[in-house]
Every structure is written in C-alpha cells, then in structure tokens.
C-alpha cells in the first residue's frame, strides 16, 4: 500500500539475460536537458557497460534498440513486432474504484501507425499514460509519466555503470532501471509494477 507522496521503486537489473528486483531509495538526479511530449520519438538513452552492448530507454519509457549480440540493432525490440515485445506495466487499485492496468509508457505519435509493411508499432493497443517527458544528463535518464485519469505519477530512472577511471566496473554487462510511483491523491492505493520479457537468445536483430 502507498499513501500520499510515498514512493515505491522497482530496481531492474538486466545482466546476461537475467532480471532481478529490489527496493530502491528515491533521490534527485541531475538534469541537463528536458524534452517535452512532442520531442520524444528519437530520444533513447543507451544502457549497458562499455563494450558489453546496450539496450536503450526510450523517451516515453519503452525499451528499444536491443544491441547486445555484437551487431547493430537500431529499432530492434527482440521481436518482429507486436504485444510480446518487452514492456513494464502498472496495476493501481484504490479502496473505492475499479482497478486499472496501464502500460508504463507515454503516448504514441500518429505516424507510428503507418508502417511501410502495414504492421503496427509494438503495444499499439495497450492503454498508456497521456503525458510523458524525458530529462537527460548522461549517464542518467528519467522518463516522467502522468495522466489526469490516474491517481499516480511515475518516474522511470535509468543509468549505466559508468565510473570514470574504473574500466572494470564501467564494463559490467548491466543496465539499471528504477520505477518510482507517487500517489497524487489522499487515499491509500494498492500498486504493483510488473514486466514481461521473452527469451530472445538466438536472435541478434540483424534480420528483424
């Protein structure tokens, strides 16, 4: 249960194809550049150690550009396309309202429904947050999600294991994500954050 202004976070460690989680203590991060909802389509923060490949945190919260198989994979999401691409979602239930499950991503742009092969963008039919923005200060990036119809805001924080002067630790094959949820109302909420990620070993993104 979370109450007003309390935050819960999920730490997701992606290393060697594995996923683990633990509680994260929220803290303020530096911001050098802010991008609003209209300028997120090409925003992607590469997450991963030096020389280990990366997966990028997109400007609206999506996981994209999975380049961990030693080949370029821009736009690769581990699948051709569809609702089985990796994603995180949030479940919110108050004491007196119907529970809601929403994709932890901001809105799509209209042109993303116009693929040259006639197929839609990943998760095109999922409910999403209405508002999104991105704050960057490499190696840190933050996606800010909000919606007037939801009693929570979410901040997605991602960063690299970049330690200047320490090549070994900077080369760890790891990406770090934290999902911070804030209750914007006065009533307690039941909140869960969960993720779905298929095993895509054997695919490198070169023929997607």
PLM region descriptions:
Residues 108-174:
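Extended, loop-rich substrate-binding clefts of extracytoplasmic carbohydrate-active enzymes
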Residues 1-9:
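Bacterial N-terminal signal peptides that target proteins for export
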Residues 2, 19, 57-59, 67-69, ...:
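Composition- and surface-driven signal marking solvent-exposed, interaction-prone regions
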Residues 22-108:
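Beta-strand-rich N-terminal accessory domains
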Residues 79, 156, 161-208:
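Polysaccharide-binding surfaces and accessory modules of carbohydrate-active proteins
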């Amino acid at each position: 249960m979370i109450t007003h202004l309390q935050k819960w976070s999920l730490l997701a460690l992606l290393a060697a194809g594995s996923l683990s989680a633990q509680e994260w203590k929220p803290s303020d991060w530096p911001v050098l550049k802010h991008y609003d909802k209209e300028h997120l389509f090409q925003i992607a923060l590469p997450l991963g150690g030096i020389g280990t490949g990366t997966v990028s945190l997109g400007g609206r919260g999506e996981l994209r550009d999975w380049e961990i198989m030693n080949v370029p994979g821009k736009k690769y999401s581990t699948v051709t396309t569809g609702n089985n691409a990796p994603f995180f979602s949030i479940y919110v239930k108050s004491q007196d309202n119907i529970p809601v499950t929403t994709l932890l991503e901001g809105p799509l742009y209209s042109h993303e429904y116009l693929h040259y092969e006639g197929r839609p963008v990943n998760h095109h039919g999922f409910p999403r947050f209405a508002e999104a923005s991105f704050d960057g200060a490499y190696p840190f990036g933050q996606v800010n999600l909000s919606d007037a119809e939801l009693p929570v805001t979410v901040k997605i924080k991602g960063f690299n294991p970049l330690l200047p002067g320490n090549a070994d630790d900077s080369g760890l094959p790891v990406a770090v994500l934290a999902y911070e949820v804030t209750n914007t109302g006065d009533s307690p909420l039941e909140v869960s954050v969960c993720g779905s990620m298929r095993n895509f070993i054997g695919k490198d993104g070169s023929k997607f």
